[in-house]
UniProtKB/Swiss-Prot annotation:
The gene is Ptcd1. It comes from Rattus norvegicus. Residues 392-407 have a biased composition (Basic and acidic residues). It is found in: Mitochondrion matrix. This is Pentatricopeptide repeat-containing protein 1, mitochondrial. It comes from the Eukaryota. The keyword Transmembrane does not apply. GO terms for cellular component: mitochondrial matrix. Belongs to the PTCD1 family.
Length: 686
């Protein structure tokens, strides 16, 4: 009877026993999680239910009763899990090591993106702007970029402002980091931030300071085209940055194109504008000095007061550039002012600081700038062209006779170098002024050296006198440039130290390095060494450039070896430039014994070799083109053979110098040992 009742419980369309067992299984699964066991009565009930289930399964297998619906559903669902894998064609192997590696990488990424806990509230974008500005003033561009990109964007996930990008682009501009600056600019546009005038000024400035001039010029011209397509109006400061790009990366013609655009837009022409034109003149090494004098005289004709920076640019032109064709220079610089001055001051009111209002500028127009351009690039066969639209100037030129190019034999003189002119003529020649020159000066003579070009500007005293007329005092850069252009070994060079004290200018190591280099080039090594006690008296410490300038005059082996020994005593390690200078001094004397001694010392100090040194040594290892080894014995050729044998072995053991990338120091991420805190308003060790 009991078996019949049990069979009825587990048979039929809706067996009651199976539902009870399912409820018990559900209760067991919910309460026995985590390896915990239930009470004893529940375990006994489960055991009894399992035994009953086994009995019924055996009874069902013996009898011909149909299969339960739940078992039918389980049979139907068997094998359906493989459907989502059956469509795959490629299977990746997965091991425990790969899984652990994946977890480690995820942990590193989460650690990088996890914001650091800071004291105080959350920082603002303007606070980050101030911190980046402070770091850039300290010359820490890499730290400023890391602070912006890692801490502000990744860790705190703040939305940057336009000023955050502009200050970093400006920092990149100071060092010429062109690639990073345009990356920041593109990221700025992706965030829908509107660039300001300061942003475009910083972008043009980074193009001007880039070490790769061609690519920088292309980037600047492309940016200029984009701004023109957007009809974006540039201010004068941005135009000056564009003018700086043209002066440093292009030539004077491109500068004049920008200059004409500045006038077309109605901007005021300032002294800074002409300074950038002077920088463009310096790019022409052949005729840059003559062009610089023309631009200078046009600036003075507008009544614009020059600055100390403008005088320094003139000295740079005298040092690096030539006068060009003497006939053209005589026609442009020695003729009457009415024929050569094309930019006239306006009749309206003049602003303070030398600026001219655009609305009242009657003398400066695009037509006159084009005439100035034709004069700047005048060829010997071309005819001198006067101002195109100055009726007042034309009437004056009709009433006054032109300056004669021919004079009486007793009054004719050529503007020759300073040492060849009479003493009274030296004081009358100064092209820096707009006044007429002496009638005795009708043409230029040989102007080949920087000292000759300085003589055209009145010499040392005349140049400083012109600065005094404009109430300008020379700085250390002015005196350093004067030291480079004065006649070597002249009294003017000796008077530079007294001028230094007279104007109370604090000397630096660059000024004394210039004097030491000039004396060493003359072969006056003792005179160069005599300047070292003056350095010590003024508290100036010599640097590697000082020893390199001394090495120029070490033509004898004992002088060169003594210099290396003195550097060792001073605990200064010679670099590649010093050894290259000594090698050059030995090559001028064809002293192979001296050359081998230099290479031995270079090997002892393990100084890496650069391309310049290799070219020097390859030239030293060459045989004379017309020598015959078997004709007769030649001691000179034997020395070359000895040097070639040592040079071959020397190359095998010497390290090579890899030139550093200009932007490498900014690409390296700084060590993350400092955290910005709001409490101190700066950096704090974290």
């Amino acid at each position: 009877m009991d078996l019949l009742r049990l069979s009825r419980l587990f048979s039929g369309p809706h067996p009651i026993g199976l539902s009870v067992l399912q409820r018990l299984d559900l209760l067991r699964s919910t309460q026995w999680t985590g390896g915990r066991e239930g009470p004893a009565w529940l375990r006994a009930a489960s055991c009894s239910s399992s035994s009953h289930q086994k009995r019924m399964s055996s009874l069902c297998s013996d009898s011909s009763t149909p299969v339960a619906p739940q078992e039918e559903e389980e049979e139907e669902s068997f094998g359906t899990l493989s459907e989502k894998f059956s469509s795959r064609r490629i299977f990746h192997k997965s091991t425990a090591q790969l899984y652990n590696l994946k977890l480690k990488e995820q942990g590193v990424e989460e650690e990088e993106l996890e914001p650091r806990l800071r004291q105080g509230g959350r920082n603002t974008p303007y606070w980050y702007f101030l911190q980046c500005k402070r770091l850039l003033k300290e010359g820490k561009l890499a730290e400023a970029l890391d602070l912006f990109e890692r801490q502000m964007l990744k860790e705190e996930r703040l939305q940057p402002l336009e000023c955050n990008y502009t200050v970093l682009i400006g920092g990149c501009g100071r060092v010429g980091y062109l690639k990073k600056a345009f990356r920041l600019f593109n990221d700025m546009k992706k965030r829908d931030l509107e660039p300001s005038d300061a942003t475009y000024t910083a972008l043009f400035n980074v193009c001007a300071e880039s070490p790769w001039k061609d690519s920088a010029l292309q980037s600047a011209l492309k940016l200029r085209q984009q701004l023109q397509a957007q009809n974006f109006q540039l201010n004068l400061k941005t135009y000056h940055a564009l003018l700086k790009v043209a002066a440093k990366c292009a030539d004077l013609r491109v500068c004049l194109e920008v200059f004409k655009e500045i006038i077309q837009k109605g901007h005021a022409v300032t002294e800074e504008t002409f300074c950038f034109l002077l920088m463009g003149c310096i790019q022409d090494k052949k005729t840059g000095f003559r062009q610089a004098m023309q631009v200078w005289r046009q600036m003075l004709s507008l009544g614009i007061k020059p600055s100390r920076h403008g005088y320094n640019l003139l000295l740079g032109a005298a040092r690096d550039c030539g006068l060009g064709d003497p006939e053209v220079a005589s026609r442009l610089l020695l003729t009457s002012q009415e024929e050569t001055i094309l930019l006239q001051p306006p009749t309206g009111r003049r602003l303070a600081g030398g600026k001219v209002q655009a609305k009242t500028r009657h003398g400066v127009s695009v037509k006159h700038v084009e005439a100035l351009e034709r004069q700047l690039f005048l060829e010997p066969s071309h005819k001198l062209e006067g101002p195109p639209a100055f009726p007042e100037a034309r009437e004056t030129s009709r009433t006054q006779p032109e300056v004669e190019t021919k004079a009486e034999p007793g009054h004719m003189g050529a503007l020759a170098p300073l040492a060849l002119k009479p003493p009274d003529l030296e004081l009358q020649v100064n092209l820096l002024s707009l006044g007429a020159l002496s009638p005795a000066v009708v043409s230029f003579g040989t102007v080949a050296t920087p000292a000759d070009r300085l003589a055209l500007m009145g010499g040392l005293e005349g140049f400083l006198g012109k600065m005094a007329e404009h109430r300008l005092q020379p700085d250390i850069k002015t005196l350093t440039l004067l030291a480079e252009v004065v006649e070597p070994g002249s009294p003017a060079e000796s008077s530079l130290l007294s001028i230094l004290d007279r104007h109370r200018v604090e000397a630096d190591i660059t000024f004394f390095n210039t004097l030491i280099r000039k004396k060493s080039k003359l072969g006056d090594l003792e005179g160069a060494k005599a300047l070292l006690p003056i350095l010590a008296k003024k508290g100036i410490v010599p640097n590697l450039r000082t020893f390199c300038n001394l090495a120029i005059g070490c033509h004898r082996p004992r002088d060169g070896m003594q210099l290396l020994a003195d550097m060792k005593k001073s605990q200064v390690t010679p670099n590649t430039h010093i050894y290259s200078t000594l090698i050059n001094a030995a090559l001028k004397k064809l002293d192979y014994t001296y050359l081998i001694s230099i290479l031995k010392d270079m090997r002892r100090n393990s100084v890496p070799v650069n391309e310049v040194v290799i070219r020097q040594l390859e030239f030293a290892a060459q045989y004379p083109p017309t020598f015959d080894r078997y004709k007769e014995k030649n001691t000179y050729l034997e020395k070359i053979d000895g040097f070639r044998a040592y040079y071959k072995q020397w190359l095998k053991v010497m390290p090579a110098e890899e030139p550093p990338h200009p932007w490498q120091e900014f690409r390296d991420k700084p060590v993350r040992n400092q955290v910005i805190t709001e409490n101190a308003g700066g950096l704090r060790d974290g």
